[in-house]
Amino acid sequence: MAIKVVKNLVSKSKYGLKCPNPMKAEYITIHNTANDASAANEISYMKNNSSSTSFHFAVDDKQVIQGIPTNRNAWHTGDGTNGTGNRKSIGVEICYSKSGGVRYKAAEKLAIKFVAQLLKERGWGIDRVRKHQDWNGKYCPHRILSEGRWIQVKTAIEAELKKLGGKTNSSKASVAKKKTTNTSSKKTSYALPSGIFKVKSPMMRGEKVTQIQKALAALYFYPDKGAKNNGIDGVYGPKTADAIRRFQSMYGLTQDGIYGPKTKAKLEALLK
C-alpha cells in the first residue's frame, strides 16, 4: 500500500525565495531535523519564515508532508546556488532526531519506506540516495551518523525497494557520467596513483595527490566546494581526507579518510 503524502505546499509567491528553479531530480538526500518538531510543524515553519532554507518532505512517526513540489529545487544541502545537492536532489527530513527514542525510530522507519517509494516511482536504484554530508560535509543526518548506521539505513531502503519490485541500482554510473560531461571530456582520462595517502606531518603533496583530488571532484566529492579550484591544490590535508571519508561512507568502505587500494578501485570503477 502506497504511503500517502499530505501536501502543504509553499505559496507560489515564495518560489523566488524557497524554490526558484525548475528541477529534474537525480538524487534523494536524507536529513535529520536536529529538533523535536513534528512533520506538520517542520513544514509550517519552513513555509512561513523568511529564510531561503527549504526542503521537499518532512517525515515523522505518523505521516509524510510535502512542502516543495518535486519539480522545483530546494535549498537544503548547503553546496551553493548551483550545487548538485541543491539543484538536483529531493530533500527528505526525518523528524524527532534531537531526542531520538521511540518517536524517532518510527519516523525513520516510515522515511525508509517513503524513500523506497520515491525510488520505485522514478525507476531509480539505491545508488541515487545521498546523505546531506555527501554534498557539503555537514554532519547530517546527525543521529544516523552518530550511531554509525548510514549503511544500515541504506540497506533497509534497498530491502524495501526490493519488496516494491524496484530495481536496486540505476544504470551503471549513469548519474556520475551525465553530470561530468561538461567538465571533463572522458572520465577514463583520470589516472589514479597506487599506494597509501593520508594526513601526516609533513603533509603529502604533489601530482599524485592532485590526481586523487580531481577524481573525487569528478564524482562531486569536492575537497573544498566553493574554494579556488574546489580545493584541488595537490595537498593531502584534512579537507581531502574528509572528501575521501565522505566517498567511503557513500560506497560502503571503511571510513578512515585514507586513500588506499580499495578506495582507488572504487573510484576507478565509477570513473569508467
UniProtKB/Swiss-Prot annotation:
The entry's keywords: Cell wall biogenesis/degradation, Competence, Hydrolase, Sporulation
Xref: InterPro entries: Amidase/PGRP_sf, Amidase_domain, NAMLAA_amidase_2, Peptidoglycan-bd-like, PGBD-like_sf, PGBDSf
Any one Gene Ontology BP term: peptidoglycan turnover
Record-listed E.C. numbers: 3.5.1.28
Listed Pfam families: Amidase_2, PG_binding_1
Broadest EC class assigned to this enzyme: hydrolase
Keyword Lyase annotated: no
Superkingdom, natural source: Bacteria
GO molecular function terms listed in the Swiss-Prot or TrEMBL record: N-acetylmuramoyl-L-alanine amidase activity
Reactions performed catalytically: Hydrolyzes the link between N-acetylmuramoyl residues and L-amino acid residues in certain cell-wall glycopeptides
Keyword Hydrolase among record annotations: yes
PANTHER family: N-ACETYLMURAMOYL-L-ALANINE AMIDASE AMID (PTHR30417), N-ACETYLMURAMOYL-L-ALANINE AMIDASE XLYA (PTHR30417:SF11)
Protein function: Autolysins are involved in some important biological processes such as cell separation, cell-wall turnover, competence for genetic transformation, formation of the flagella and sporulation.
The protein's name in its UniProt record: N-acetylmuramoyl-L-alanine amidase CwlA
Gene source species: Bacillus subtilis (strain 168)
Lineage: Bacteria, Bacillati, Bacillota, Bacilli, Bacillales
Gene (name only): cwlA
